[in-house]
């Protein structure tokens, strides 16, 4: 099958993860999945929410938003509308859950890390790009906290890596990492979050048109795992590179 951008069914879009995009944030990344671009920052603060105080455990949370012209038509800022949309809440919670899956709260100590993921340009897969980029920003923020002795020596707050990718069935063919044009044509689409050792954190799947069977589900999950494996390699390479 020939895809819109010439990729094979099992091929990711070109992925880049550029660290050090903010001079202020303890961790920052511009992540690109093809034409989808998300700016992720990680901010470290000493202390935890009231309900966490005295536990000796840290906390990680996330917020997600889109710039007004991230899509082909301008959307009002949610701050202007005076209400955060349900989709925004859902994706923010998804990003937070995904990152907390690889955090050792005790090792983090009573510190809070907030990930802010802002979509600069959307062409499908914004939430999966946000998770993948936010992990790298989180890793840099953790390293910063360790360097400032906010995290006790010898402790490792990160227990592994986490990344995410979209998969879907378009024209009867399972595809990896859908762009927007593929996403709107998909009979089935799914977002899959995996740890670096191949375990699932979250699987969000919906039949948009035709219901899917177990064989198709397995094919999509296999595609997603292979995609997340590739993303984990890209994340590691980004973290090993020297920031500018």
From Swiss-Prot:
Its protein name is Ribonuclease PH
A GO term, aspect molecular function: tRNA nucleotidyltransferase activity
- Which family does the UniProt entry place this protein in? Belongs to the RNase PH family.
Residues the record lists as binding phosphate: 87, 125-127
PANTHER family in the record: EXOSOME COMPLEX COMPONENT (PTHR11953), EXOSOME COMPLEX COMPONENT RRP41 (PTHR11953:SF0)
Q: Which UniProt keywords apply?
A: Nucleotidyltransferase, RNA-binding, rRNA processing, Transferase, tRNA processing, tRNA-binding
The UniProt subunit note reads as follows: Homohexameric ring arranged as a trimer of dimers.
Q: Which organism is it from?
A: Streptomyces avermitilis (strain ATCC 31267 / DSM 46492 / JCM 5070 / NBRC 14893 / NCIMB 12804 / NRRL 8165 / MA-4680)
Q: What InterPro entries would the database entry show?
A: ExoRNase_PH_dom1 (IPR001247), ExoRNase_PH_dom2 (IPR015847), ExoRNase_PH_dom2_sf (IPR036345), PNPase/RNase_PH_dom_sf (IPR027408), Ribosomal_Su5_D2-typ_SF (IPR020568), RNase_PH (IPR050080), RNase_PH_bac-type (IPR002381), RNase_PH_CS (IPR018336)
Broadest EC class assigned to this enzyme: transferase
The EC number on file is 2.7.7.56
This protein's gene is called: rph
In the record, biological process GO terms are: rRNA catabolic process; rRNA processing; tRNA processing
Entries under PROSITE patterns matching the protein: RIBONUCLEASE_PH
């Amino acid at each position: 099958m020939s895809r819109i951008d010439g990729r094979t069914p099992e091929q990711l879009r070109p992925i880049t993860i550029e660290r050090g995009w903010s001079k202020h944030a303890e961790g920052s990344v511009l992540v690109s999945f093809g034409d989808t671009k998300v700016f992720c920052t990680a901010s470290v603060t000493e202390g935890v929410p009231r309900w966490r105080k005295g536990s000796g455990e840290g906390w990680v949370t996330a917020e997600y938003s889109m710039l007004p012209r991230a899509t082909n038509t301008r959307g009002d800022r949610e701050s202007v509308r005076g209400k955060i949309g349900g989709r925004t809440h859902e994706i923010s919670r998804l990003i937070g859950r995904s990152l907390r899956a690889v955090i050792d709260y005790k090792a983090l100590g009573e510190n809070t890390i907030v990930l802010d993921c802002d979509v600069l340009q959307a062409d499908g897969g914004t939430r999966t790009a946000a998770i993948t980029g936010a992990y790298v920003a989180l890793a840099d923020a953790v390293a910063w906290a360790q360097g400032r002795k906010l995290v006790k020596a010898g402790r490792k707050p990160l227990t592994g890596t986490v990344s995410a990718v979209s998969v879907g069935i378009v024209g009867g063919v399972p595809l990896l990492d859908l762009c927007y044009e593929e996403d709107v044509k998909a009979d089935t689409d799914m977002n899959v979050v995996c740890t670096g050792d191949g375990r699932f954190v979250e699987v969000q799947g919906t039949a948009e048109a035709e219901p899917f069977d177990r064989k198709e589900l397995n094919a999509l999950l296999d595609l997603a795992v292979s995609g997340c494996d590739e993303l984990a390699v890209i994340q590691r390479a980004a973290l090993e590179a020297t920031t500018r």
